[in-house]
Amino acid sequence: MKYLVLLLVVTLTACNQPDDLALYKTNLEIAKKGISCYESPANLEVYKSLIHPDVKHQSAMYGQGIVGYEDLIGQAKFYMEGFTNVTFENQLWLPGVDTTTLATDGSVRVYGTWKGESIATGASFSVDSYHYFHIKDGQIDFSGDYFDATGMVQAVSASAETTPTETDPAETAPTETTPAETE
């Protein structure tokens, strides 16, 4: 009987191991530091120090796909030097999970809203986003951004502030044709 109880205890404890969030908590600080580099005042040098040289990053920019270190730093520079008064609001930080086992794997993900202004035009933006980070040896080695980057850039561009001009109705009116012209 005592072996049966022991077997039951071992089985239950082996099957119900609590998720270890220690790695997530360590990586969370690195991910938060990376996000904060985009907020005003931006800090590209600190951001560079957080990125692994072999990073693979899913870009939010249309047509970019997965990019490496140089392209990721180029995109970061574009945002950091092109926008001011940037904040990341309504943050919801969550542990990432292994897609096979659904156990926490130390990765980090976050939902939030970016707000700021274009330095070139002064136009403001607000865009909801999702980001994920996998961290290796204290640096981000796999990450991704999901938000409407192209729409955000178009919304704050100088051309977005101009209004369409009225066209001359004579230029767009359909022309009449006679039956003889169509034969």
Language model features: what each stretch is:
Residues 1-3, 183:
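Short, Lys/Arg-enriched, disordered terminal segments
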Residues 3-13:
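Sec-dependent N-terminal signal peptides
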Residues 15-183:
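C-terminal and inter-domain tail/linker signature
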